UniProtKB/Swiss-Prot annotation:
The EC number(s) this enzyme carries: 1.21.3.1
Species assigned in the record: Streptomyces jumonjinensis
Keyword hit for Iron: yes
Sequence ranges assigned to domain Fe2OG dioxygenase in this UniProt record: 180-286
Residues involved in N-[(5S)-5-amino-5-carboxypentanoyl]-L-cysteinyl-D-valine binding: 87, 91, 183, 189, 212, 214, 279
Alphabetical list of Gene3D superfamilies matching this protein: B-lactam Antibiotic, Isopenicillin N Synthase, Chain
Function comment: Removes, in the presence of oxygen, 4 hydrogen atoms from delta-L-(alpha-aminoadipyl)-L-cysteinyl-D-valine (ACV) to form the azetidinone and thiazolidine rings of isopenicillin.
Protein name, entry field: Isopenicillin N synthase
């Protein structure tokens, strides 16, 4: 069962000290992260150094210029049986059934000669891209953005590490750029005069995506100006405030697993709002063979109970379970 979070407060945390040399300032940020992670489970990361206006411009341009044929050619196996990809590719809207559409891409380091690609290890795919003559700035931007968000997320993880009583570089090795299974999803929610049927929560709220826990170490999300997210708390479902400038950060179930839910994955959902908007999550994942042994965080009670599992095994099982629960996105 998901953990009901004690608060709906979502603080904004200046993460820039985590990239500096001031140990006291780093510890201060770590304690702010600790409070947020054990409160609502969410915080906004400010002073992140990412050009979010350029991000919006490129993603809007991409969605605006994609033809139906291009979408089909790039569609994942669930929508196009000629494409073996199950992660990287286009996730199509289906008229009368499903309005949301998205493009997901993986680590640019995954090339044909990458050991995990050569061995056909699950969850690893060489990215397919739209025609670069028709979309000249899309691939270069996306590959650079991936590396920016990996660096940003690694810095944020140093704050989590300090908050857990570990060295600040505790997670660095598991997040090496050559092997990380992290992904970016460029999700578009359209405005439609006639919207397909949407699901309804137990409390009567219409939903674009039902309640779920993220399958990740952490999720680092940028979204445009429409408020739509809710977190499940001891007082029921509560709105998460929006931000036009900052990245929303929360733990995924792997952090919950290795910390024995000292830092739980907050249960959250997406309200249905008929408005044009973008949701752009970066799901931070370790490498396939990475193993982080569960531990009892500093200051927490209890003993180690959770089993050790490789990250690849965790991710494959978790993504399958999410599709079974909430359906194919």
């Amino acid at each position: 069962m998901p953990i009901l979070m004690p608060s709906a407060e979502v603080p904004t945390i200046d993460i820039s000290p985590l990239s500096g040399d001031d140990a006291k300032a780093k510890q201060r940020v770590a304690q702010e992260i600790n409070k947020a992670a054990r409160g609502s489970g969410f915080f906004y990361a400010s002073n992140h150094g990412v050009d979010v206006q350029l991000l919006q411009d490129v993603v809007n341009e991409f969605h605006r210029n994609m033809s139906d044929q291009e979408k089909h050619d790039l569609a994942i196996n669930a929508y196009n049986k000629d494409n073996p990809h199950v992660r990287n590719g286009y996730y199509k809207a289906i008229k009368g059934k499903k309005a949301v559409e998205s493009f997901c891409y993986l680590n640019p380091s995954f090339s044909d000669d990458h050991p995990m690609i050569k061995s056909e290890t699950p969850m690893h795919e060489v990215n397919l891209w739209p025609d670069e003559e028709k979309h000249p700035r899309f691939r270069p931007f996306c590959e650079d953005y991936y590396r920016q968000l990996l660096r940003l997320s690694t810095v944020i993880m140093r704050g989590y590490a300090l908050a857990l009583g570990r060295r600040e570089d505790f997670f660095d090795e598991a997040l090496a750029e050559a092997d990380t299974l992290s992904s970016v999803s460029l999700i578009r929610y359209p405005y439609l005069e006639e919207y397909p049927p949407v699901k309804t929560g137990a409390d009567g709220t219409k939903l674009s995506f039902e309640d779920h826990l993220d399958v990740s170490m952490i999720t680092v999300l940028y979204q445009t100006e429409v408020q739509n997210l809710q977190v499940e708390t001891v007082d029921g479902w509560q709105d998460i405030p929006r931000s036009d400038e900052d990245f929303l950060v929360n733990c995924g179930t792997y952090m919950g697993h290795i910390t024995h839910d000292y830092f739980p994955a907050p249960n959250h959902r997406v309200k249905f709002i008929n408005a044009e908007r973008l949701s752009l999550p970066f799901f931070l994942n370790a490498g396939h063979n990475s193993v982080i042994e569960p531990f009892v965080p500093e200051g927490a009670a209890g003993t180690v109970k959770n089993p050790t599992t490789s990250y690849g095994e965790y991710l494959q099982h978790g993504l399958r379970a999410l599709i079974v629960k909430n359906g194919q996105t």
